[in-house]
């Protein structure tokens, strides 16, 4: 069963996840893309523990297998909503093994620690995961040419 901890506790894994982000999202993080995986991960590992913040999943040997982040803004069509669960990634060999669910649960705990009552997520691919984990779809939008489904979840302490 994976262990989930804040990225700020193991910032040495930023380089590993930067490579994964560049391979998973080449239009954004790859050559010619607008994003910088290393800069985003550096921000997610901030030692103060405020937004943006990321959590990582480690396997039993302590190797990184997944990441998810909580940040202030995500897609430009929904700037009125905040904060956002973003940058969800699980290595291919660990997908469908509940790692994503553990990462989402840890993000909810981080949101609660930071005093948030609701968080949001935009996704094109993780719809079934979010639905299984109790998220509710509230909208849809096209972002960077891709249809995104907008979900929300009440932070448990705020229920």
Map each language-model feature to its residues.
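Conserved acetyl-CoA-binding loop-helix of GNAT-fold acetyltransferases
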Residues: 87-90, 96-109
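Active-site rim helix/loop that mediates acceptor-substrate recognition in acyltransferases
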Residues: 26-56
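C-terminal "cap" of GNAT-fold acetyltransferases
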Residues: 16, 122-124, 140-159
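Conserved acetyl-CoA-binding loop of GNAT-fold acetyltransferases
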Residues: 131-141
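Conserved beta-strand in the GNAT
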Residues: 54-56, 63-73, 84, 89
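A short beta-loop-alpha structural element at the N-terminal edge
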Residues: 2-17
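Short coil/loop residues immediately preceding or within conserved phosphate-binding loops
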Residues: 52, 80, 85, 146
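Conserved GNAT acetyl-CoA-binding A-motif
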Residues: 111-124
């Amino acid at each position: 069963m994976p262990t989930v901890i804040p990225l700020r506790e193991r910032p040495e894994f930023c380089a590993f996840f930067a490579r994964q982000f560049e391979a998973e999202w080449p239009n954004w993080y790859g050559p010619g893309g607008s994003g910088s995986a290393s800069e985003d991960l550096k921000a997610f590992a901030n030692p103060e523990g405020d937004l943006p913040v990321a959590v990582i999943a480690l396997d039993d040997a302590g190797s990184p297998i997944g990441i998810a982040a909580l940040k202030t803004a995500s897609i430009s069509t929904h700037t009125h909503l905040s904060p956002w669960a973003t940058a969800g990634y699980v290595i291919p060999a660990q997908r469908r093994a509940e790692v994503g669910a553990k990462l989402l649960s840890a993000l909810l705990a981080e949101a609660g620690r930071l005093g948030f009552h609701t968080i949001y997520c935009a996704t094109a691919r993780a719809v079934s995961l979010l639905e299984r984990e109790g998220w509710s779809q509230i909208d849809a939008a096209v972002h960077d040419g891709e249809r995104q489904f907008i979900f929300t979840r009440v932070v448990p302490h705020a229920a």
